[in-house]
Amino acid sequence: MGYDAETGHRIKEPFNQVCWVHSVRKVQDFRMKQCLFGEHLLSDSSAVMSAKPVAIVESEKTALVAAHFIHDFIWLATGGMHGCFNSEAMKVLDGREVILFPDLKATEEWRRRLPMLESVCRRATCSDLLERIATNEQRSLGLDIADFLLMEDTPQMILQQMIARNP
């Protein structure tokens, strides 16, 4: 999978830079079954982890960044707007409270998928937070929650800037 070094977004133009091993090896009758990125975190049965709601985002990068900044959720990713967002992959969310955090411009698409989750999850909602706070430019870029989290300087970044100004 190719990522832009400056933005952290996937490279999709001039072509999608994803290479599947089964395609390269030309495996006959291969049936791929995708899972949610971070799904293994759901098997942690500790009281702290089992009580946390699940947050689902599109990108694996976004799940990692959000997990660093926001510890209140178990962050999972579908691997794209459509990714593994299907009833089979969502079965692992049985009995969980789930909040979807779609990228800008994908909120309505993900809202349409709520009934699929409501049949499995204890509770399922779709956040429109980004749509409410985004500028038109941010919306046109299709930013995600990680992009917003990374816009703010962290305390460590501020400290480094102060050291650079006052050696």
Where are these regions (language model features)?
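Phosphate-handling DNA/RNA-contact segment within nucleic-acid enzymes
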Residues: 1-94
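Replication-associated primase and helicase/ATPase modules
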Residues: 4-10, 46-48, 53-57, 68-69, ...
